[in-house]
A protein has these predicted regions:
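Non-catalytic, mostly N-terminal accessory regions of nucleic-acid modification and defense proteins
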Residues: 1-168, 232, 236-247, 350-353, ...
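Short, contiguous acidic/charged loop-to-helix segments that flank catalytic cores in large enzymes
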Residues: 3, 270-298, 323-331, 352-358, ...
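Hydrophobic alpha-helical scaffolding
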Residues: 121, 213-219, 258, 293-297, ...
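Conserved S-adenosyl-L-methionine
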Residues: 146-261, 265-279, 289-291, 301, ...
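Short, surface-exposed amphipathic charged segments that create phosphate/polyanion-binding patches used
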Residues: 256-257, 361-367, 398-403
């Protein structure tokens, strides 16, 4: 992050501490910053040399508020939020249901003045984006806010984009887009002159037609819209690039070239989904997804099926999934077999611990290419990069960086992934990059993709065992997976009675 961006983040975030004493959470504060920065930017755009129509009604602009103090400021801010919530497009989506949560008027005044001092429009989109991303990260670092679940490590996002290598005038979806991190990384990749020299129509497509997102949580949805707008994605009056809602409820109808996503971690969905061939118990609340391969209450498994639906026949996906997706029985096994049959599930990246804000998370990235319908099995081999064994990061003292993922990207060989070379061999058993034939995988119990071969040195070192929370998380995950497998077996036995 640049020094300018870092200084602004520190100043703006410094005002949050006294607000905490008034019961204002980091998330609430960030939401208020979203509203205020948007108002200030809109005011700047309405003036020379831009003179842009902002859509904000007269009497409800930044300049109608920024000189006020005390109760007058509070009342005017409240009136602006209520009025703009009734507007259309991105404007209305950002301000819908907005209320002032900074009841301390002296701090509200200080925040307004701090934002007023900066010329946001004259900043490059990189600087604006850095500032907002910095604020999002501050929010994610707050354990109590729970916002870390929406925050995928940026080095991982960039590596996933680098491997997929999205092309101009192609569409990209994220069905649980959080604050929009995958979209911003894809935009940066596409706009980088080292990758492509975009012409005018390609730039316009990148801004208005490339991205399709869905986000369930209202506050996060608003943060995402603001984040995209600050990075020049979307338009005040054009198509809103992100919809609010549960992506799993139905087939959205669109088909895209790429999916980049990190579905929310968590074992169960509150709704059981069924495909066209499965029966349900009467008490279940059911959404009939005829496009799904099988029924599951596991959110990650449902997202994989949803991603398969929204991909074009030649589409490509990179998806972060927890370990249980790779080894769980029942629906998990059915979905793994379907992926191997109907897509080219060519790569798995085993992720290290300590990179997510939720402690003890063990995750992977699966890369698969959809294929047109064919009687032949589409996956011939699966390449696995073990970036977990004997690797550990922490969020503060030893965070994962872009450089840490360069070896994986080189092994992946994005320019032509069919020209790959294993680093593992009988002579080099410590190699992290290894190929497995699909026949080897199909012979494994439950078609498990949870494959590792490196010796875990921490298990041999009793003084360097994993942290207790990691061990506890492992035990809980294994017990939950076993319980779900037994539950599915019991349900199947009931149906057969």
């Amino acid at each position: 992050m640049s020094e300018q961006s870092s200084n602004i983040v520190s100043k703006v975030w410094g005002l949050c501490n006294p607000l905490r004493d008034d019961g204002v959470s980091y998330g609430d504060y960030l939401e208020q910053l979203t509203y205020l920065i948007f108002l200030k930017m809109s005011d700047e755009y309405s003036r020379p040399p831009y003179k842009r129509e902002t859509g904000i009604p007269k009497g409800y602009t930044w300049s109608d508020m920024n000189t006020l103090k005390g109760a007058e400021l509070e009342n005017q801010y409240r009136a602006i939020l209520e009025r703009l919530g009734d507007e259309g497009g991105i404007l209305g989506q950002i301000f819908k249901g907005a209320v002032n949560k900074i009841s301390n008027v002296s701090i509200l005044y200080r925040v307004v003045q701090m934002i007023d001092k900066e010329n946001w429009v004259s900043m490059s989109s990189d600087v604006k984006g850095e500032i907002y991303e910095g604020l999002l990260q501050k929010n994610a670092e707050d354990v109590k806010s729970g916002a870390g679940q929406y925050f995928t490590p940026r080095p991982l996002i960039k590596a996933m984009v680098a491997c997929l290598r999205p092309e101009p005038k192609k569409t990209i979806a994220d069905p649980c887009c959080g604050s929009g991190g995958f979209f911003l990384a894809a935009q940066a990749f596409l706009a980088n002159p080292k990758n492509y020299a975009l012409d005018r129509t390609e730039k316009e497509f990148l801004k208005n037609e490339t991205f399709y997102g869905t986000e369930l949580v209202v506050a996060t949805f608003k943060l995402c819209l603001m984040n995209l707008y600050l990075h020049n994605i979307g338009d005040l009056y054009g198509k809103v690039p992100v919809m609010r809602g549960d992506a799993l409820l139905s087939d959205p109808g669109y088909r895209v070239d790429y999916v980049l996503t990190n579905p929310p971690f968590g074992k169960k969905s509150s709704i059981t989904f069924t495909n066209e061939e499965e029966e349900q118990e009467e008490e279940d609340l059911v959404y009939n997804r005829q496009d799904f391969w099988t029924t599951s209450s596991n959110k990650q498994l449902n997202f994989i099926q949803h991603i398969n639906t929204i991909l074009k026949p030649t589409g490509k996906a990179a998806v972060v999934v927890p370990d249980n997706v790779l080894f769980e029985g029942g629906s998990g096994e059915i979905i793994r077999k379907k992926l191997l049959e109907t897509t080219d599930l060519h790569t798995i990246l085993r992720l290290p611990t300590g990179i997510f804000y939720k402690p003890g998370v063990k995750a992977n990235v699966i890369f698969f290419d959809k294929r047109p319908a064919s009687p032949e099995r589409q996956t011939k081999e699966v390449w696995i990069y073990d970036f977990r064994t004997n690797v550990h990061f922490t969020l503060r003292q030893h965070p994962m960086t872009d450089a840490d993922l360069q070896d994986f990207i080189q092994c992946y060989h994005p320019e032509n992934r069919h020209e790959r070379t294993e680093t593992w061999s009988q002579e080099n058993p410590e190699g992290r990059w290894r190929r497995f034939s699909v026949e080897e995988i199909l012979e494994r119990d439950k078609t498990s993709l949870d494959i590792f071969w490196l010796k875990d040195k921490s298990l041999a070192d009793l003084d360097n065992l994993p942290e207790p929370d990691e061990l506890a998380a492992d035990i809980i995950e294994n017990l939950q997976s076993a319980l779900e497998s037994f539950q599915e077996l019991m349900n199947q036995l009931k149906k057969n009675d």
